[in-house]
């Protein structure tokens, strides 16, 4: 019933915008070879950027640990105590992550944006990366102690989500920086595609790792998986005062 109601609401919204939005004729080129050539030139210009190979590796592995964690964390929260999980109900999990976690994630992103605007990305990227990755250790603690106190669990989730939002700000700003110049919008779209690949591929084998080693050892593996992303920061070339308000 819920999804049916949502589909009806989306249909009504689409119909409304179809009627209300102005209809303008746009000239479109049907020359497929020209479109392919433009696509090729944009792609080529992206891969000819200075130190682009380092940038691509960084984008791919910055969230290597978190890409695995995000797939398994919900299962850990909902799994029974006998299976090594926390045994939360769907309602409890939804409140902790959907409400508290989302709020802390947003606040972390806002705080990160404010700090970068004041002092620039170069000064903060290491600290933001650490803020994203170090809180992952709360899952190691929870998998070891299996706390039943919902306030404690909620607090740990908030810490991890705040750190994630805080650290993700630097990640986005870096992609914006390397996308600057001609075709910046297209180049940023390429970056987001690479970013999505960096989330999808590690998530594909995270379940297999968890089933083989259990929750506790899996979360230790997640901590170890965050190290390559931290190391890559050493090789990045970041513009002085980039992101800082002038």
Spans of model-derived segments:
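Intracellular juxtamembrane helix-capping segments at the cytosolic ends
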Residues: 166-180
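Hydrophobic core of transmembrane alpha-helices in multi-pass small-molecule transporters
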Residues: 149-170
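Short amphipathic helix-loop junctions that connect adjacent transmembrane helices
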Residues: 62, 71-94
């Amino acid at each position: 019933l819920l999804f049916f109601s949502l589909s009806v609401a989306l249909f009504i919204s689409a119909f409304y915008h179809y009627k209300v939005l102005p209809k303008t004729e746009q000239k479109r080129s049907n020359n497929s070879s020209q479109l392919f050539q433009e696509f090729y030139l944009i792609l080529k210009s992206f891969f000819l950027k200075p130190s682009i190979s380092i940038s691509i590796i960084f984008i791919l592995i910055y969230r290597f640990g978190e890409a695995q964690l995000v797939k398994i964390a919900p299962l850990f929260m909902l799994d029974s105590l006998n299976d090594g999980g926390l045994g939360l109900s769907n309602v409890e999990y939804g409140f902790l992550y959907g409400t508290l976690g989302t709020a802390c994630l947003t606040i972390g992103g806002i705080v990160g944006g404010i700090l970068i605007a004041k002092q620039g990305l170069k000064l903060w990227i290491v600290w933001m990366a650490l803020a994203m990755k170090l809180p992952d250790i709360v899952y190691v603690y929870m998998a070891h102690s299996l706390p039943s106190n919902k306030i404690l669990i909620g607090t740990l989730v908030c810490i991890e989500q705040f750190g994630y939002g805080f650290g993700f700000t630097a990640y986005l700003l870096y992609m914006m920086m390397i996308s600057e110049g001609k075709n910046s919008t297209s180049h940023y779209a390429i970056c987001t595609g690479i970013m999505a690949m960096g989330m999808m591929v590690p998530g594909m084998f995270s379940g297999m790792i968890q089933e083989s080693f259990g929750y506790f050892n899996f979360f230790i593996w997640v901590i170890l998986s965050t190290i390559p992303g931290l190391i890559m920061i050493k090789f990045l070339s970041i513009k002085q005062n980039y992101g800082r308000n002038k």
